[in-house]
Design a protein with these regions (language model features):
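A short acidic, Gly/Pro-enriched loop at the edge of an enzyme's catalytic core
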Residues: 111-120
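Conserved beta-strand signature within the Rossmann-like core of class I S-adenosyl-L-methionine
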Residues: 148-156
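Conserved SAM-binding strand-loop segment of SAM-dependent methyltransferases
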Residues: 100-110
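Conserved class I S-adenosyl-L-methionine
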Residues: 56-63
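Conserved Class I S-adenosyl-L-methionine-dependent methyltransferase catalytic core
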Residues: 1-50, 54
């Protein structure tokens, strides 16, 4: 709850000013984009193509933010998406953004998710999880993913394994979080 309040439940108008029109919070794919909106659409489409998303597939998005990816996957690929976030503000706006689509945005901790999904998508949440919780996070993915399912992880990565985050980053950007290394995620 603390992370949700400090990091995500801030002024909606500020967030709208900082992000693209879909309120995508993570980096985009600028390889063929001329503006932020196009870069975010290109990133979301790349994720959908990489996981082979098809109509009717059930998708779990961990750390769904304002529902931007969930909306895109449902509108463009016909997926049925369940997104979870620990931000009440994100749930409220996400439900509004995804109204009328086969999307459910839940106020729920990733550790409490149940069900089985064709795809599990994780875009920009590992930075918030913290190294002490990587194993539990990966167990959640394993528990909720069908045997023939595909999981997708998009995160900022570090070259060095750290257990204490940068004080400035921890205070102003990722409360209780840190940048994961491949070694930490592989344990």
């Amino acid at each position: 709850d603390e992370v949700g309040r400090k990091h995500n439940d801030i002024d909606k108008d500020l967030n709208r000013a900082m992000h693209d029109s879909r309120m995508v919070y993570t980096c985009g794919d600028r390889s063929h984009a001329d503006c932020l909106d196009d870069a975010q659409i290109a990133k979301m489409d790349l994720v959908c193509r990489k996981v082979g998303l098809r109509p009717g597939m059930k998708v779990l998005e961990l750390g769904c933010g304002w529902g931007s990816f969930a909306r895109y996957a449902a509108e463009t690929y016909g997926a049925e998406v369940t997104g979870v976030t620990i931000s009440k503000e994100q749930v409220e706006l996400g439900c509004e953004i995804c109204k009328g689509l086969p999307v459910e945005i839940r106020y729920q901790d990733y550790r409490e998710v149940s069900g089985v999904y064709d795809r599990v998508i994780s875009i920009g949440i590992l930075e918030h999880v913290g190294y002490k919780n990587y194993r539990v996070y990966m167990k959640t993915v394993d528990r909720t993913l069908k045997d023939d399912g595909i999981a997708f992880f998009h995160t900022i990565g570090g070259n060095v394994s750290i257990v204490i985050g940068n004080p400035w980053t921890t205070r102003y950007i990722f409360p209780n979080g840190q940048i994961p290394s491949i070694a930490q995620l592989g344990k």
